[in-house]
């Protein structure tokens, strides 16, 4: 009987269909009993004789694989494989898959929601109201600002598409990979331009990050990049936590530079 370890959380909580499918095919499965993202050591203790891991973003390292002699498949739920040692998996003929399209619509919608929240001070107003403080904040309209999108893959392109419903904001794009189909489609739009990253940092009222975590993008945004942004700009990261240096972001915001940040990843 095939044994499956489900480490990603939550899994089957909102919809039991995935678990019912496993049961239908007589698959022996274990859902993460700790109900949280596992550390490397926790995964080492748990992985045992499982054949398949349905994984989240927990680190699946050589050490983990050493303790999983039967492991044949790592099925990553979500975008990005930076948490999996792909070289080690290839050496062991372990199949690695992922679901890049599944979370893209939700993350792109969340990103636009975070923009609106930051630009309208929704969260800050809510906090102050609960403290009995009545303070009127002046917001900004999306159609009247410049938005910089770094990374125009599935999620970045989704954000771009959603923004078309908010009038015609000026949009600056940057990506390490050429997207010729998207470029040709956007050539007719005068409010959208491809630029370098520094131009995005310097000219944008909102900077939103949608790149994978790699050696090249780790700590891509540090104090230097944050300080050339507008004083009242906001930054959003819904990609990977390691892309923005969090200590630098904290220090810069404590100094009064930047008016807000929305971080969905750590």
Report residues per predicted region.
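Rossmann-like adenosine-cofactor binding region
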Residues: 62-65, 169, 178-266
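Hydrophobic/small residue at the entry helix of a nucleotide-binding pocket
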Residues: 155
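Glycine-rich, N-terminal phosphate-binding loop of Rossmann-like dinucleotide-binding domains
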Residues: 8, 57, 78, 209-211, ...
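N-terminal glycine-/charge-rich "phosphate-binding" loop or analogous flexible N-terminal tail
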Residues: 1-50, 172-174
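Phosphate-binding beta-alpha-beta segment of Rossmann-like dinucleotide-binding domains, i.e.
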Residues: 92-94, 99-146, 150, 158-161, ...
């Amino acid at each position: 009987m095939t044994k499956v370890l489900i480490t990603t959380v939550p899994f089957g909580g909102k919809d039991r269909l995935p678990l019912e499918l496993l049961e239908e095919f007589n698959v022996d499965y274990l859902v993460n009993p700790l109900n949280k993202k596992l550390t490397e050591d926790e995964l080492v203790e748990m992985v045992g004789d499982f054949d398949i891991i349905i994984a989240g973003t927990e680190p699946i390292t050589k050490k983990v694989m050493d303790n999983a002699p039967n492991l044949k498949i790592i099925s990553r739920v979500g975008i990005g494989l930076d948490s999996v040692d792909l070289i080690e998996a290839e050496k062991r003929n372990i199949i690695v898959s992922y679901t890049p399209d599944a979370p893209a619509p939700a993350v792109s919608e969340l990103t636009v929601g975070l923009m609106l929240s930051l630009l309208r001070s929704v969260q800050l107003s809510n906090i102050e109201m609960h403290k009995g403080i009545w303070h009127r904040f002046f917001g900004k309209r999306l159609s009247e600002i410049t938005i910089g999108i770094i990374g125009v893959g599935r999620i970045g392109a989704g954000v771009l598409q959603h923004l078309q419903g908010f009038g015609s904001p000026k949009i600056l794009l940057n990506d390490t990979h050429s997207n010729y189909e998207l470029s040709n489609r956007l050539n007719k739009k005068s409010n959208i331009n491809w630029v370098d990253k520094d131009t995005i940092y310097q000219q944008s009222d909102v900077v939103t990050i949608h790149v994978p975590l790699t050696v090249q993008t780790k700590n891509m945004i540090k104090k230097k990049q944050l300080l050339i942004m507008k004083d009242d700009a906001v930054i959003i990261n819904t990609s990977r936590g390691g892309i923005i240096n969090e200590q630098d972001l904290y220090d810069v915001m404590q100094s009064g530079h930047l008016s807000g940040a929305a971080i969905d990843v750590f």
